[in-house]
Amino acid sequence: MASLRDVARRAGVSVATASRVANGNPAVRPDTRERVERAMRELLYVPDTPRADTGLIGVLVPELANPVFPALAEAIETRAAPRGLASILCNTTSAAFREIDYVHMLLDRGVEGMIFISCEMTNLRGEHGHYERLVEEGARIVFVNGATNTLDVPSVGVDERAAGELATQYLISLGHTRIGFVAGPEHYLPTQLKAAGRATALAAAGMREDFLVAYADFGLEGGGRALAELLERPDPPTAVICSSDVMAIGVLHEAARRGLNVPADLSVVGFDGIEATKWSVPELTTIEQPIDLIAERAVDTLQRLIASPGDDHPNSYYRPTLRVRASTAAPAAVRVAASA
């Protein structure tokens, strides 16, 4: 673990000054205190005091507005409680500095491990240094839907590549040949994996990549903006796959605003399987994450890490499920040909 001497060196102060800050001594100038506290956060410094097993784990989510994240957090909490583990939920609002602050707070509380859901690790342009320090310090952490090959951290989640492939295969089976992708930000790993799955399915069907992809922020407005962009293309799509159900609901809204009928004019497929998809108009076809399986395996993996940190803890990826509802149909040209 980082020592007080490391903190002092980072902050450019004496060990005695760093010690006074760590012990809450008020006899330190405010600007000096701020430098030392910043160094503590950056180094994930925790005072070297003996702790008993706390039974606490941290669960960090990027936001609460998208229902899939509270659903995953709740499923984790439900499975952790019978094992004697109490969850502390932290909403990072997709901000690296906030995630780092929460990590420091959780370590200070003596958590036995942490589960990061769709964390900053999925942002390929993001700040990853705190994960590297956590691994170096032997912290017990598990990524959920945050796959990485760069750190020795077990990852549990849905197979994002399979999700993109499954959605594309289904739309091809309906007769669609112009299949757009309403994507999240390009520099996020889940976006790239879904895009790769889509490309694989197109190639397997003998269809060339048509680059009908529009990148936008995750969320309702992002989905609407991405669809608007795709519809302005010279040869717009007859179907779209969305990075999330929330983006897909934004697509439904934008389609209705433009007077398009879903699915007669445009088929829409979401991703996640949130409860709201059963109540959208029309009901949304979606690629569903196995949330309960993911939560069970994440808690099990973390508990094994806590008990046996030196053992091998492999990654676990689950194949998603296609839920066909009312937002998808054959394209108009196929329907006309079939009725002729």
Residue ranges of predicted features:
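Short beta-strand-centered segments that line the small-molecule binding cleft or hinge
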Residues: 100-111, 115-162
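Short, well-structured alpha-helical segments in soluble
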Residues: 98-111, 223-235
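N-terminal helix-turn-helix/winged-helix DNA-binding helices
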Residues: 1, 40-74, 83, 93-94, ...
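Flexible loop/turn connectors
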Residues: 4, 228, 232-340
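Short acidic capping loops at alpha-helix termini that bridge into adjacent secondary structure
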Residues: 177-178, 209-212, 262-267
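Hinge/beta->alpha junction and helix N-cap segments in small-molecule ligand-binding domains
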Residues: 31, 61-71, 89-98, 120-124, ...
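N-terminal helix-turn-helix DNA-binding module of bacterial transcription factors
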Residues: 1-54, 335-340
